[in-house]
């Protein structure tokens, strides 16, 4: 599935899944403008994406804190001006904090919801405003999580923020498709990322060991989490393509059967 001529904004492209998607979109021929607050990581992703052999697209990095609505508005204006338009938003940026549910404080909630939910709202609004004003039947791809469906040990705030993203996306999928034929979907990835490694390092050791021992039962395919480039990027390319124009309001679980088993 090729994306020649597509103009795509990606959030969180300084590392992990989003960086992999930036590279994948560029390989597929898209023009990509992406953001992060990690400038070192963002510039590295830009260099890596543009250095890929036979890649016909281009990636450009800008700094943007998606918790700041004004910053998001300014970022979208720059990105759209640079690319000459917008067809797809892949909103992938995300954060988490892990501790027993009874120990969470306001700062934890503000931090996690600020990126995961508020950032989703601000970026989605800017994309839709452009699509509606210009008659573009665009696509919005939000990142949620299986934890929004199943819960997560020591991750109550993270799981709650992702449940909020799922509810938001299903609602705008109804409203914005009816108004402007804009399609909105969620992806729930069970993919090895820096965030996953962080969870392994910071969660209760007993919980981590129990989780590792259960991987083979949790993931029917491979008995483990998937890889960004081989397992996730092809799904993201498809959802950004015209071939996915009739897919709307869906939660695509790229997880080797994890939720099915649970």
List each language-model region with its residue ranges.
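Canonical Rossmann dinucleotide-binding motif of NAD(H)/NADP(H)-dependent dehydrogenases/reductases
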Residues: 3-33
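Residue(s) in the substrate-gating loop at a strand-loop-helix junction
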Residues: 145
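Short, small/polar-rich loop/turn modules that mediate ligand/substrate recognition or access, typified
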Residues: 177-183, 247-249
């Amino acid at each position: 599935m090729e994306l020649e001529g597509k103009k795509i904004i990606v959030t969180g492209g300084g590392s992990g899944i989003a960086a992999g998607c930036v590279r994948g979109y560029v390989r597929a021929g898209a023009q990509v403008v992406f953001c992060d607050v990690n400038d070192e990581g963002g510039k590295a992703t830009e260099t890596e994406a543009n250095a890929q052999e036979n890649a016909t697209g281009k990636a450009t990095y800008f700094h943007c804190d998606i918790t700041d609505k004004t910053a998001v508005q300014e970022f979208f204006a720059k990105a759209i001006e640079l690319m000459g338009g917008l067809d797809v938003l892949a909103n992938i940026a995300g954060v988490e904090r892990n501790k027993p549910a009874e120990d969470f404080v306001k700062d934890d909630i503000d931090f996690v919801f600020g990126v995961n939910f508020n950032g989703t709202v601000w970026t989605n609004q800017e994309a839709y405003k452009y699509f509606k004003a210009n008659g573009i039947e665009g696509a919005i791809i939000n990142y949620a999580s299986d934890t929004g469906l199943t819960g997560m040990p020591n991750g109550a705030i993270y799981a709650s923020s992702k449940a909020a993203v799922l509810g938001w996306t299903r609602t705008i999928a109804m409203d914005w498709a009816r108004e402007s034929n804009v399609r909105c979907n969620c992806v729930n990835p069970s993919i090895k990322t820096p965030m996953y490694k962080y969870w392994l390092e910071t969660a209760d050791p007993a919980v981590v060991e129990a989780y590792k021992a259960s991987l083979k039962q949790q993931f029917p395919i491979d008995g483990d989490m998937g890889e960004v480039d081989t397992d996730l990027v092809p799904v993201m390319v498809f959802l950004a393509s015209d071939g996915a124009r009739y897919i709307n309001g869906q939660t695509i679980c790229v997880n080797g059967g994890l939720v099915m088993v649970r």
